[in-house]
């Protein structure tokens, strides 16, 4: 009887200890300040004619009206333990800032992970996406990248993106060893993160708006930003003015600057340290799927970029996660079950560069 009692007490102690550790891990966030602002963009010239305030919105011609367009929208959070190294986050294609804030299975996203480590978060919706939907040049149907050109009929893409993002061969299956959250609910939440452009994507306008975001962060904090990009956002990131960037962390960017190009030289001259991360299922992905070859080309291009960048006096690290023992990650490593492990690796890299 005594043995059973001791076993019960021990089990209860372990349960309570586990709960305490869980509570400690999920301690309340201490945020000193949070808010939103817009940055960049333009104001269109007035529509031909005179504005009549008596009819205002009833006048379908919109005569005399202007529009504020092509800006970025920023949600920011500043922790009480702010370490002076803010992070600006830029989403990829079909995404918004939501992807940095949570995971499909409801865990804390990278924005919160780094916030707990003292990095203020500046979460961007680029022009024409999310809460920055106003664009000067709208497509004829308003959603050119996901709607058919000749009608309002929606062009579905769940399965295509699932395969291309290397989550599995065909939804809902996952590749062996996958870190993507399991279950129908998590998959449903992931697909519902996808959001369209409100018009034609313009990389130059997006980069200009992000440059203004960086300038605003510098003005507000007095510090340059760590720039964390993903996928299509990586392509935008290489074009953003460098004067307010402390470092770039590119998560599977769609490409890297051509060696010797204006992009390349601008980054090199500014001595911007760069870390580029790639997940799994690239070298070991199905050869009959076109996306496997695409990601190999992108990864190999990044390795070539890093080799030249470093030889020219720059500082670029390409992290191939399987090669350092972190396996099972798709294109969305920051939303997967081992996302904290990868974030810790990034934090270590930032520390090596005096940025934490």
List each model region and its residues.
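N-terminal cap/lid segment of alpha/beta-hydrolase-fold proteins
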Residues: 23-82
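Short beta-strand element of the alpha/beta-hydrolase
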Residues: 84-92
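Conserved alpha/beta-hydrolase
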Residues: 107-133
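Active-site glycine-rich loops that stabilize anionic/oxyanionic intermediates
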Residues: 91-103, 254
């Amino acid at each position: 009887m005594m043995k059973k009692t001791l076993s019960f007490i021990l089990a209860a102690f372990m349960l309570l200890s586990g709960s305490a550790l869980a509570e400690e891990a999920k301690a309340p966030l201490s945020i000193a300040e949070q808010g939103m602002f817009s940055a960049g963009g333009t104001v269109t010239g007035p529509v031909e004619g005179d504005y009549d305030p008596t009819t205002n919105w009833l006048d379908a011609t919109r005569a005399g009206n202007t529009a504020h367009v092509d800006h970025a929208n920023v949600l920011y959070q500043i922790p009480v333990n702010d370490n002076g190294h803010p992070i600006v986050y830029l989403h990829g294609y079909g995404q918004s800032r939501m992807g940095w804030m949570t995971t499909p299975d409801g865990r804390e996203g990278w924005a919160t992970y780094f916030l707990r480590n003292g990095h203020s978060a500046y979460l961007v919706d680029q022009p024409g996406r999310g809460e920055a939907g106003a664009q000067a040049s709208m497509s004829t149907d308003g959603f050119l990248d996901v709607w058919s050109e000749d009608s309002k009929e929606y062009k579905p893409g769940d399965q295509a993106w699932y395969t291309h993002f290397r989550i599995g061969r065909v939804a809902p299956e996952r590749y062996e060893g996958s870190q993507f959250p399991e279950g129908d609910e998590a998959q449903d939440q992931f697909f519902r993160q996808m959001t369209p452009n409100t018009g034609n994507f313009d990389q130059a306008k997006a980069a200009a708006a992000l440059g203004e975001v960086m300038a605003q962060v510098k003005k507000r904090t007095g510090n340059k930003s760590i720039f964390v990009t993903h996928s299509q956002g990586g392509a935008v990131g290489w074009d953003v003015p460098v004067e307010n960037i402390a470092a770039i962390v590119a998560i599977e960017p769609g490409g890297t600057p051509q060696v010797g190009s204006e992009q390349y030289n601008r980054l090199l001259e500014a001595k911007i340290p760069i870390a580029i991360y790639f997940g799994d299922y690239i070298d070991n992905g199905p050869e009959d799927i076109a996306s496997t070859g695409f990601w190999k080309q992108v990864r190999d291009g990044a390795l070539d970029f890093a080799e030249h960048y470093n030889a020219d006096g720059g500082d670029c690290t390409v992290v191939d996660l399987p090669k350092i023992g972190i396996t099972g990650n798709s294109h969305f490593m920051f939303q997967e079950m081992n996302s904290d492990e990868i974030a810790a690796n990034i934090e270590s890299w930032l520390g090596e560069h005096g940025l934490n």
